[in-house]
Curated annotation (Swiss-Prot):
The gene is rplX. One of two assembly initiator proteins, it binds directly to the 5'-end of the 23S rRNA, where it nucleates assembly of the 50S subunit. Keywords: Ribonucleoprotein, Ribosomal protein, RNA-binding, rRNA-binding. Part of the 50S ribosomal subunit. One of its GO terms (molecular function) is rRNA binding. Pfam families: KOW, ribosomal_L24. PROSITE patterns: RIBOSOMAL_L24 (PS01108). SMART domains: KOW. It comes from the Bacteria. One of its GO terms (cellular component) is ribonucleoprotein complex. This is Large ribosomal subunit protein uL24. It comes from Ureaplasma urealyticum serovar 10 (strain ATCC 33699 / Western). NCBIfam families: rplX_bact. Belongs to the universal ribosomal protein uL24 family.
Length: 110
């Protein structure tokens, strides 16, 4: 089960992009990867055609493994730091909660 969803703020915990943070653009659970805004940038040489208006060297985000990402705690004394996630039942619905501060992670998405 993925604990990271689209729109979450995450921080990279290992690799060349360590300590960089950004918002998740897309999650691919089958491949266990995610696209994070501003993290793991690559350069691609691209020709101009009907689908791509720009030509030349394009910089874009590359997928990064989910095991290298951790959710950022939105509140509490550890605001902005990595946290683990636990699930609680609230009104017969599963809610994601930050382990460090105990704040709900899905509350601001509605």
């Amino acid at each position: 089960m993925n604990r990271i969803k689209k729109g979450d703020t995450v921080v990279v915990i290992s690799g060349k992009n360590k300590n960089k943070s950004g918002v998740v653009i897309q999650v691919n659970p089958k491949e266990q990867t995610a696209l994070v805004e501003g993290v793991n940038k690559i350069k691609r040489h691209q020709k101009k055609d009907q689908t791509h208006e720009q030509s030349g060297i394009i910089e874009k985000e590359a997928p990064i493994r989910l095991c290298k990402l951790a959710l950022v705690d939105p509140k509490g004394k550890d605001k902005g730091k990595a946290t683990k996630v636990k699930y609680l039942l609230k009104d017969n619905k599963k809610v994601r909660v930050a382990r460090k501060s105990g704040s709900e992670l899905d509350a601001n998405k509605k």
